[in-house]
């Protein structure tokens, strides 16, 4: 019979996996010296490296502790995992119970996410300047391992939802300091359905 890992070893494995994620995120920022946000000319390399960091993290079975996979009944729950000491980025695990969804939103900063466990439904929207509303474009399933990265603005309005019967967990990295992860990321918009 295989023994279950003790809490200390689970914590140590998660810390090591998060250290690898931090290292990969820092490597992405090495492509944008002297700036907390990539310029247009730097964004392709930065985006590629962010996607690679998220893909690598999604493959880590030990990235999160059991406590970091706990949800909440009243809405999706964020667990802050990494707050860059220079304020360039913050990473969080979001836990989605069945039926929970984000509001329709664009972003005040660049962001990327990876689905770690379960599945999410992502609805993409186009911004209509004339009506100042978001118009639904398409919906796509985002299974475990799916990765996305977008720049700031209203060019990537979306809504994530857990339509499944079990919880889902996703990893999000945002271009904000850790203390701004709840207020400095999403730009809520009104959608027409």
Model-found features: residue ranges?
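N-terminal leader/capping segments at the start of a protein or of a new domain
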Residues: 1-60
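Glycine- and acidic-residue-biased ligand/ion/polar-headgroup-sensing regions
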Residues: 109-125
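A short hydrophobic beta-strand segment most commonly corresponding to one strand
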Residues: 112-114, 165-181
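Asparagine-centered strand-capping/turn motif at beta-strand->loop junctions
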Residues: 159-164
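Mixed-charge, glycine-accented linear interaction segment located at domain edges/termini
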Residues: 183-186
């Amino acid at each position: 019979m295989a023994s279950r890992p003790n809490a200390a070893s689970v914590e140590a494995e998660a810390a090591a996996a998060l250290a690898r994620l931090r290292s990969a995120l820092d490597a992405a920022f090495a492509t944008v010296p002297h700036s907390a946000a990539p310029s247009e000319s730097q964004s392709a390399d930065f985006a590629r490296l962010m996607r690679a960091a998220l893909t690598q993290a999604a493959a880590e079975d030990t990235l999160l502790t059991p406590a970091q996979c706990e949800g909440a009944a009243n809405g999706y729950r964020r667990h802050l995992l990494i707050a860059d000491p220079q304020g360039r980025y913050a990473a969080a695990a979001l836990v989605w119970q069945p039926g929970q969804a984000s509001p329709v939103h664009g972003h005040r900063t660049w962001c990327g996410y990876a689905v770690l466990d379960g599945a999410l439904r992502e609805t993409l929207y186009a911004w209509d300047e004339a009506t100042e509303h978001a118009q639904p474009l398409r919906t796509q399933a985002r299974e475990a391992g799916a990765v996305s990265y977008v720049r700031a603005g209203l060019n990537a309005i979306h809504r994530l939802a857990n339509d499944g019967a079990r919880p889902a967990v996703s990893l999000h990295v945002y271009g904000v300091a850790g203390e701004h992860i709840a207020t400095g990321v999403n730009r809520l918009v009104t959608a027409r359905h």
